[in-house]
Every structure is written in C-alpha cells, then in structure tokens.
C-alpha cells in the first residue's frame, strides 16, 4: 500500500510517497512559488538525480496535478498509475477542540477545519485548498486529515486553560492548543521502540527544536502539557519568535513606541528570538560561526536557549512526577550538540549523565543514545519523521 503525504503552505507544497510495507519514501518533493512567478518542482528519488520542473502554476490544484504527473512520469516517476496511491494524508495545522485524532475527510470535517481558520489564519486556508485540490483530481481516493493539534488534546483543563475571564474560552475558544503534535507523537513512540518498552510505560520529555520550538511532557504515551499555546508564538525562545514574555510588553510597545498591533505581532514573530538577541540570524550554523568569533550576543542567545529548555525539562519532570527519557529532535535538536549540552548540564541531580563523545556524534541513524549507560534518565537524539507518522495515521483509517 502506498500513501501520498501532502503538506500545503501558502505558496508551497511538500510531498512524499511512502510505501507502507517497508515504510520507505519512494519519492519526496517540494513545489515552490505557487501562484507567483518562477514556480518550480524539485523531486528526489533515492539513487537518482533530482528531477526539476519549472512551469507556471496558478494555484495548488495545478501544483498537485504536476506532483501526480511527476510521480507517474515514465523516466522520473516511481509508480505506473495513480491507482497505486491507496490514500492521501494531509497535514492540517489546527483542528481546534473537535479533533483528538486523525479523521477521514468529509463535508463536516471540512466545515470544522474552515471554522478553525480564525485560530490558524496563515496555515489552515492552504491546508483546505490542498485537500480540495486532491479531491478534485483523485475523487475515488480516501483523504485523511492529520492535525498538528490533535496529540495535545489529552491535556487536562488545568494545563490548557489560561487565567483570563472564562467567557474568552467559552465564546472565543482561547486556550492552549499546542503544535508539532505529529512530531512529538512520532519521537515519543520511537524512543519507546528503541528502549524496547511500550510508550504507556514511559515518562518522556520531547524537545522539538527547529526554527519553531516546542517541548512536550508525554506521560504514558499521552501529551499532558506542551510549551506552545493558543498560537505557536508561546513557549521557549525560537528562531525569530520571542516565546513567553510579560504580556504587558505588548501594551508598552504600542503606547510608548507607537507601534500598531500588527507591527508588534510582526516584531514578536519575525524579529525576536535567537535572531533578535544575537543579531546574526536564525540559522544555527551562522550562530555557531559567530560563537567561534566570540560574538557575545550569539553566545547569549544560545545560553538563553539552553537555559529555557533546561527549565522546561525540569518543570515537566515535576509535572509528571518523574522522568525516564528525554528526546531531542528537529533541525537544531538533531544537529546542535552545543544546545543539548547547555540544556542538560546542571540536571545531573535528576539522574542525567551526558556522554560527551556520543553527544558530539553526527551518526544519529534512526536514533542515538547520548547519555551514559549509568544515566538513570536516558537521553536520545531521534530524527523526526512527520511524513511517516502522517502516513501511519492515514493507513490506520483506510
């Protein structure tokens, strides 16, 4: 059985075709600049040169049509016909409170996703467009929605409620939702597999450290708390997002600096975080180079990052009443040993002993244990695979 995984952005589309018998990606690709000049598809197949197509694509339907043509192309494709695609799994950023698991697409589901647009105005609209385009082109193929927010729907009220007037929750649905759920679920299950245990036996802190950052307490295989909140702006410092700050700073910037609400939103989302503190950028390779040149602001940004992760690990160990394992994943989590060492140094008292040589290893494979054998709490680096998780969730429903 082959599952096509689709992740639609506002002007881009990522895809993978996964053979579920082996769980291998037969092809993966990216379509960029949809609806604007210079539209381009880049497809990768193991053992072959990249397949690149440049042609005008007026919308996501054009893009998906090109994806399907590329997958069945006689010279560059990996399947003979679209009939080989058993189902399509769609990443949907926000499912609100209605969805605690993945669902088959129907009219009611589409209506509910549309109602969540106000909660994810940048992400849900292109997700919806992608689903509709696939339905148009593949009317007899089952479609499944896999929600970023679903994994966190197991949080209790005390974890997800904000201490605001209660009607803001009942009328406006303002609460903590959490994001990166598919990634957190994947690595929480993967670490259990690597430890030869069931996820239900473990208390795990999963650290998804990319340009966006979220940390989750996974107790018995279920999310009980997470750092991102009503939006992906909350939590620890991120690439260009501030994370948690005193909310009064917002009103201060509006009143004292004369910024509009939109300008402040732009500052907090695009000009803050590691970029804002370091003045260097969001790419950790650039931060690493700046640290090598003794750039004090780059060092400070990395210190803040490590400190905030450490605080969160400690807080979640307390919330769960114990800790068995920590997982680092995503771009920075997988490739920045200097962040991991900052996050873990000082946590020896809760049973963490880091193996420095393993921490500096680049050979991660499907998952690398970077704590010492004697470490009570096991620490792993595990490459995330959201596409495979989406495909598994899709397969379970069709």
From Swiss-Prot:
Record site feature (Transition state stabilizer), residues: 180, 241
Alphabetical list of PROSITE patterns matching this protein: ACETATE_KINASE_1, ACETATE_KINASE_2
GO biological process, one term: acetate metabolic process
Record has Magnesium as a keyword: yes
Keyword Signal among UniProt keywords: no
Compartment(s) where it occurs, according to its Swiss-Prot or TrEMBL record: Cytoplasm
Assigned keywords, A-Z: ATP-binding, Cytoplasm, Kinase, Magnesium, Metal-binding, Nucleotide-binding, Transferase
Enzyme Commission number(s) from the entry: 2.7.2.1
Annotated binding of Mg(2+), by residue: 7, 386
UniProt cofactor(s): Mg(2+); Mn(2+)
Reaction(s) catalysed (UniProt annotation): acetate + ATP = acetyl phosphate + ADP
Described function: Catalyzes the formation of acetyl phosphate from acetate and ATP. Can also catalyze the reverse reaction.
Binding partners and assembly: Homodimer.
Family that this chain belongs to: Belongs to the acetokinase family.
PANTHER family membership: ACETATE KINASE, ACETATE KINASE-RELATED
This protein's name: Acetate kinase
Gene that encodes it: ackA
